[in-house]
Amino acid sequence: MKAFATRALAFSVAAGQALAAVTQGVSDNTYNRLVEMATISQAAYANLCNIPATIQTVEKIYNAQTDINGWVLRDDSRQEIITVFRGTGSDTNLQLDTNYTLAPFDTLPQCVGCAVHGGYYLGWLSVQDQVQSLVQQQASQYRGYAVTVTGHSLGASMAAITAAQLSATYDNVNLYTFGEPRTGNQAYASYMNEAFDSASPETTRYFRVTHADDGIPNVPPAEQGYVHSGVEYWSVEPHSPQNTYICTGDEIQCCEAQGGQGVNAAHVTYFGMTSGACSW
């Protein structure tokens, strides 16, 4: 709603945050790209229903112990290798969601001092070999293809950790997350912002998409050492390029400023698409 935008801007003034940190409107190309990635991420809840026709499935990613689900896909029309993770879909996933212990990011030693969400790191460890092997196979066969990672909710944090890992091997990895919880500490956030050129919207390859008052980006609490990264793209109704806001600087100014708590209506629906509904 427009009211959300007004409240966010008012909050920025109260917090002393420069208004220039919130910019209204994105290009049609950017908006269409966000919607496309949201479609894939929401479809992951229902075995990739109704994904764009140009995208073909390479292989499924799965670990029974953590119930992490995902797929490696390929879009030859865009020359792109895509990895997508499903969000929370079971009690096993919920156990990962609520493990807020910060775990050292030991699989990425380049990320000095980095720690990430303990539950999602366990998820990453459970599928790391599958993901890296599948992406390597595709990248070797389709040289020059871009590498993109996406996901919603739990899948968003899985995507972020995966993209961080892949960025150590591949140039210009792209990351699109939807309703992403806070995923790591300040060292991790700084690493991600540098690795994904997130100093400005013009250069970023890390699009952290939020919606209205989605409550999940407010967890885990910042007081526990968690910090968001990437450039936030905040979508409000009615969805359009003009109603998409670019939020940089202080993370508590757009979605997070709305006071949403937990899994609410705004969390399960992005750009009018409800997780797994396949009605788009």
UniProtKB/Swiss-Prot annotation:
The active site is at S153 (nucleophile), D214 (charge relay system), H267 (charge relay system). GO terms for cellular component: extracellular region. Metal or basic ions Mn(2+), Ni(+), Mg(2+), and NH(4)(+) decrease the activity by 4.4% to 14.1%. The enzymatic activity is inhibited by Zn(2+) at a low concentration (1 mM) but not a high concentration (5 mM). Loses about a quarter of activity by the addition of 1 mM of Cu(2+) or Fe(3+) and activity is completely suppressed when the concentration was up to 5 mM. Low concentrations (0.25 and 0.5 M) of NaCl improve the activity by 5.6 % or 8.3%, respectively. Glycosylated. It is an enzyme of class 3 (hydrolase). Residues 1-20 form the signal peptide. It catalyses: feruloyl-polysaccharide + H2O = ferulate + polysaccharide. Optimum temperature is 50 degrees Celsius. This is Feruloyl esterase 1. It comes from Penicillium parvum.
